[in-house]
Amino acid sequence: MKIKVKVGLEWHQRLCSRKLFCHCPSNLNLDPEYWITRKLRISSSELGELDPAAAVEAARSRIFNYGFNRSSACLVELDEAPPFPLNEEALMIVLKMALYFKMMVVDEVRVMRKTVIDGSNTSGFQRTALVALGTPESYIETSEGKVSLKTLCLEEESAFIVEKGGSEVSYKLDRLAIPLVELATAPEIRSPEQAEELAEEVGLMMRLTGDVQRGLG
């Protein structure tokens, strides 16, 4: 039986650059030298409202342990210092990709914050910047037709989970804030085979830029 599907894909690929909001290198798999313990609490937004999903997570009252090495994390990752200006090298890489995929660069790149209190980010939110939007020329041709590209973003990666228990979770901070390019398509994929073909094509195109890391996250 042929299954009808309507699918969009989203890629998150690490960039070959230092971290997004500090000068730490993107060194992975370093053994932690130190551990800190935190408990994240929910607060109201600028509109005085509480995020429902964040409220549910806060009610679990979990303890978060963070391991870090001074060669790959600093006070910014620990949320003990404000973020530095956005990594311009990473931004330039994503701007080049926008031209490569024939997307329209936005007039002003602004960093947005998404509430995340599952412990994967010490600050309690993830930073993302919209860099480009799709145009009629922004598409990937497949054997089953065109698939439109919708958005291109620059964002920070989350911390790496080491161990998870009922009321306690442990993370490593070497991965936190590594710059990622995020590319999203329109939901125009009509079969699993087309999705696989598209994923392979976009992955190859990104690697050909020479500006992305290889391997699984």
Name each model-derived stretch.
Residues 1-217:
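Basic, nucleic-acid-interacting segments
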